[in-house]
Amino acid sequence: HVLKATNTLPADTEFNNTFTPAATQAQFKFTKKLEGKELTKDAFTFELLENGKVIQTKKNAADGTIQFDAISYDKEGSHTYTVREVAGTDTNIDYDDMNAVVTVNVTKDAASGILTAKVTMPEDTEFNNFAVAPVKTRFDFTKALAGRALKDGEFTFQLKDANGTVLQTKTNNASGVIAFDDLTFTNAQVGTHKYTVEEVRGSEAGMQYDPMKAEVTITVTKDGHVLKATNTLPADTEFNN
């Protein structure tokens, strides 16, 4: 009269739990600097790319900060990003063409299973733009009159561009100076510009007018982000009547 207990266990007697580590995050911040002009909020646009694909687009804050959103990682691995500025349409701005490379290495602690993201930023994290100031230049010609005294405003002269368009019309002063106004050149006008200065033929009886077409060349060059204008005047800058 003895009882006997027989246990029947399942084939699997082990409870298996899976630990899923919490995602880790990484965030990048760059700066924008503008020289020659006050920086304003949202003036410039920046892109964050991974594998050549744009994943975020941001604009600068008023203080120049460029803050990208945090990126989450739920597994180990290495990630490479590029940050670049989107070139704008303002021809008076020299935009920074830097491609800043950021790497993120995500590792997992063997004991705790916790993920950690290590961010490696480039040495240069500042995008530098330059507002290129226009350059101005001017020149004078002279008028000489033989046979009598020259009067103020007596003769008229025109400054024409290479297409023959009249840009300025001026008269001489009593001393014979023909003073033209400033010519202004912007960042988009680097190069060579040609002009002519001509006397407008009058109708005074007995007056012999000078038919000279004086050629003027202005060469606009750029040293870094500074414009320079160089005038090349003809050997003869005097109109003789």
Describe every region a protein language model picked out.
Residues 1-241:
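Solvent-exposed loop/turn and edge beta-strand elements of beta-rich ligand-binding domains
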